[in-house]
Amino acid sequence: MTSNYLMKTCTLILNRSKLWFAGSVVLAIALSKISASETLWSLKPLVRPALPQPSITNESNNPIDWFVDHMQVQQGLKPSPRASHRQLLRRVFNDVWGLPPLYEDLEWLNETGMEKGWAQLVDRLLGSPHYGERWARHWMDVIHFAETHGHDEDAPREHAWPYRDYLIRSLNNDKPYAQFAQEQIAGDAMHPGNAESLIGTGFLAAGPWDESSQMGIQDGTLDKKVAQYLDRDDMITTTMSTFLGLTVHCARCHDHKFDPISIEDYYSLQAVFAGVDRNNRPFDRDNDIHQKRQTLLSQKTDLLADRYPESELLNQHAKTRVDRWTESRQSVLDRWTFSVPDFTEETASKASFQPKDHSLFFPKPASNQGLLAWTFTSPYTKPTGIQLEVLPDDRLPHQGPGWASNGNFRLSEFKVFSRPAPTAPWVQVQLQQPQNDFSEHTTSVRYLIDNDDKTTWGILPQTGTAHRSFFEISPETLIQEGGQIKIELQHHHKEALWIGRCRVSLTDAARQDIQPFLAAELAKAFSTPEDQRTRVQQLTLSRHATLEHWNQKLNELPPSSQVYAATSFFHSAGNFKPSLGPREVRKLIRGDIQSPREIMLPGALSQLKDIPWNPGERELSQESERRLTLAEWISHPRNGLFWRTMANRIWQHHFGSPLAGTPNDLGHSGQAPTHPELLDWLACELRDSNGSLKHLHRLILNSSTYQQSATFRDAAAKIDASNQYYWRMSPRRLDAESFRDTLLALSQDLATEMGGPSVKQFNMRPGIHVTPIVDYKGFAPGESAMTRRSIYRFLFRTLPDPFMQAMDCPDASSWTPKRTVSMGPLQALALMNDEFVIHMSQRLSETLIKDHARVPSSITALFHKALLRDPTPEEILLFSEYTSQHSLANACRFLFNSNAFMFIE
C-alpha cells in the first residue's frame, strides 16, 4: 500500500468525521512519517528503463510511442489516427514558434509528404530564432520574471531585459541544460568576466523585491533581518522548484511534512544565498574591453589601498604624468575667482574685508542664532561650482575658524541666491554634490543644503586650521555675468557657534575638472616648488596624477552595459547596502526571527546522499563559491530530479499537460507521473544527449503520439475522460502571447527585430509614491512599439496589461508552472472590443482588399491565412453577407473570436 493511497484515504476519513483537531494533527504527523519512510519516485536513481514491447498494431519506430502504447493497451485504449496536414502545421508552428504557418507551408507539406517533409519541417522550426522567443516565455512563467519590483513600491527595472535575451540566445543555441542551469545560479563564478554567464544570474533576481523594506528599514533590526530572510526565500523557492520540482520552502518553519527535507536543509540553502542581493550589475560584452576595464579597476584598488608599488609612482613615466597633471590642475585653479563683497547685510554689516586673501572677518556675535550675508558681482555667466573656505585667525579662540570657545563653529545652512539686476527678485541657486575635507562626528557638509535647521556642519577637533566645502551648481541655474549673487550663512544652533573668518570662490571650469584640492596635504604638495618637494609629497602628487590618468582611461572605454541580476557589490541606496560577504544565517525555530538557533553552513538536501556536496572542497567563504557549489550539485548527472523536472516541462508544453501533473512539486503531495517509465526515459535522453533540449523536442515532435488527431471518441472518453493516456491530442486554446503575435503575423505587421530593451506598450507618468501610473488604453494600437513580439513587452507586476490578463497571461508576482486556461464572457468582450484586436482586424482587411478585388476571394484568403483551409460554400455565403453589412474588418474580428481560430487541434 503506497503512502499516497494512505494519505488520500485518511484525509477522506477526516473530512467525513468530526475528530478533534488534536487527533488530526497526530494523524498528519503519522502520515508524514509514512511518506518520509517510502522512497519518493522522483528521488530514486535515474536509470534508463527497458523499452516496452510495442503492440502488433503499433508500427512506430519511436520509443515514445512504445511507452504510450504499452499503457494504452493496459487500459483498453487505442491511439487516434494521424491529424491532417493542416492541423499538424497549426499545432507544430504554435508549439515551437508561437506563430501561425503560411498557406504556402501547407502546400509544401502536401507536395513533399509527411515521410520526407515532416522531419525537415521540425528541423527548420527548431533552427529558427522564433523557437527561443517562444520557449523563453515558458521559462519566464516558471521563475515569475517581470521588470518591476512588485509589492507596494512597484518600481521599474530598466535593465532586466538582458536576462530575457540571454534565455532566447541560450535556447536557440541549444545550450547544454546543465550549463544553462549553472549559469543562472552561478554564472559569474563559473566564468568570471564572461558577460553571457554573468547575465544568466538575472535568474536569481527575476522575482519580486520589497524595496520599501530593503531600503527603508535600518540594518541590524529584526524587521530588516526578516526582509533579508524572505528575499533569500524567494531565491531558494525559485531555484529549487524550477530545477528540481520540490517545495523546499515548506521546510522553513519545520521539517517538511511530506518530503524528506529537513529544516536544517532549508537553512543550509539560506546560507548558500546569504551574501546575494539584487541590483543593476555592469558588464562588457567585448572581452578585450572587459580585460582593460578590470586591469584599470584593479590598479585603482591597489592604489587607493596603498598597495601599489612606490617605485611605479616615482619613475620617469610617473614624473611625466605628474608634470602634465599639475599643469592641467593649475589651469583649472586659475578659473577659480574669489568673491569681492559689494556690501554686507544684517549681522555681517560690521564685517571687515581682507583684500590680500579675499576673506571676510566677522565680529563676535551678539546672539546665539542669526545670519551672515553679503552680496557680490558674478564673474561668470554660467558658474559650475562654488567653494566655502573657513580660515584660522589669531583674533579667534584657538585661532578659530569659529567663535566657539574651542575654535569650532556649527553652520546650519549654506544658501546662495542670484538675480540679474538689483531690482529683480532673488532666486535660490540649487547646489548639489557637496564635498569637504573634514566633518565633525555627527555633522556633515551635506547638511548645509538639506533645508533642516537642526542639522549642522562643524570641524571639531580640527580647529585652528583651514577647511573647505565644495558644491556643484545645478546646470539648470541661470546666472548672468555681472548679475548679483547673495551668500547666506545661517546659524541656528542653541549656542553662539558662528563662523569667524571665511571666503567664497566661484568657477566656470568643466564639471569633470572642478573638484577642488580638499586634502590639505595635497594642496601643500601642489604649492611646494618641484625641487623642494619631499618624497612623501612626490608620492602624494603622483598618486593623484596616476588616479586621474586611470580615470581618464576608464572614461575613454565604451560605457558598460547593465543587467538586473544577483550581485554582492553595488552602490548603497538608503539602508540597502551590499553585504560584501555572506551574512550570518541561523536556523529559525518555527521560522521566527526571534527564535534563532545554531549558525548554519551552506549545503543542500541531505537525503540525496548519492550526489556529492562540494567534492572540490572549496572553502565556501565567498558567496559566489557557495552558489557555484549548489549549481554543480543541482545539475549533477546523478541528480534524477534535475533531469526529470525539465523533461516533464518539455512534455507539458507539447501536449498541454505534464506527465507528472504538478511540475513544480514532484514530491509526495504532488501528482505521480502517469507514465513513470516514459518520464525516466525522456530524462535519460536529455541527460545522455549532453542536455540537448532540441533533441527532446525532435523525439516528441516526430512521434505518432504527438501527431495524433484531436478527434473526440465516446468509447475512449468513457475509459479515460481526461486523456491522461494520450489516446488523442487534446485541443488547446491559443495563449495570450500566441493570440497577440498571431494577429500581428496575419496582418503582416509583426516586427522581425529581436532583443533589446523591452517596449512599453503603455503611457507612463510618475505616481504619488514609487509605483508609476500606467495607462494601457491611452496607448495607440498603431504605434510601432505594438508590433514587437509579446515576449518583448515590458512586464509590470501590479499593473498588468488588462487584455493580456483577460487572456490568462499569468501574474508575475507568483510562480506559474502551469497556466490557468479559462473561457468566459470577459474574454469574449476583450476579443470583440479591445482596441488592439480592432486595429489588427482593420489592418488584415486592408491587406486582403489590396490583394483581392472581390469579396468571396477575400474571404477565401482570410480562411487560408487564419485557418489554413478553404472556406465551405456556406461559410463563403455567411461571411460575404456579414462583410457587406458590417465590413471586412468586422468579418476578420468575427473569425478571430471563433473556436476554429482560438483553438489548436
Residue ranges of each PLM-predicted region?
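Primarily short, surface-exposed interaction patches in extracytoplasmic proteins
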Residues: 56-90, 95-96, 100-130, 145-192, ...
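Short beta-strand-plus-loop segments that form exposed binding edges in beta-rich domains
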Residues: 390-392, 488-495
